[in-house]
């Protein structure tokens, strides 16, 4: 059903026109392309359904894994900084509004959720785990996608001990 509709859409559009691969990609929206940042944000927000959806919809390669790890580490360092600030002032709104660099308005809600879930000790443990995974990936590049996927699924489903 769905595939037939997409093929009919392409056929209708392509009458008397030269069809490019870009046009086909725009016409067919069988899969939604999510960014690595969305994957990491949803994982850290413990949004298991969305995390699994992103993993299933995207076709990440072993090469993408290093970039995912780097983005994950950068995000965790930012959350660690915010978490430490929250421990000092005990005010989530103040922590978010006074963050430097400022948090983009679209990211504020998910960042609040992440800070509420992850405490300083847990964040540090995640950073250590990610460094170990990166080292394992460099030793055996062929299993990169398995290491990263397992880590992401584990973090999105695990209950944190705060």
Model-derived segments and spans:
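Short helix/strand-capping connector loops at secondary-structure junctions
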Residues: 109-111, 126-136
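Non-catalytic interfacial helical region
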Residues: 1-41, 45, 116, 133-144, ...
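Small-residue-rich helix-loop
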Residues: 18-122, 159-160
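Short coil/turn segments at secondary-structure boundaries
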Residues: 22, 83-86, 127, 142-146
């Amino acid at each position: 059903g769905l595939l037939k509709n997409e093929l009919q859409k392409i056929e209708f559009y392509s009458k008397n026109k030269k069809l490019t691969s870009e046009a086909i990609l725009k016409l067919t929206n069988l899969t939604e392309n999510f960014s690595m940042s969305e994957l990491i944000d949803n994982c850290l927000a413990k949004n298991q359904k969305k995390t699994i959806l992103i993993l299933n919809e995207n076709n990440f390669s072993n090469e993408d894994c290093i970039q995912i790890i780097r983005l994950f580490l950068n995000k965790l360092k930012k959350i660690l900084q915010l978490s430490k600030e929250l421990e000092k002032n005990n005010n989530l709104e103040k922590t978010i509004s006074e963050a430097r660099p400022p948090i983009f308005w679209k990211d504020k809600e998910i960042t609040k959720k992440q800070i509420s879930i992850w405490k300083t000790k847990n964040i540090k443990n995640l950073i250590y785990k990610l460094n170990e995974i990166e080292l394992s990936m460099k030793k055996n590049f062929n299993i990169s996608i398995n290491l990263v996927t397992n880590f992401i699924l584990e973090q999105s489903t695990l209950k944190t001990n705060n």
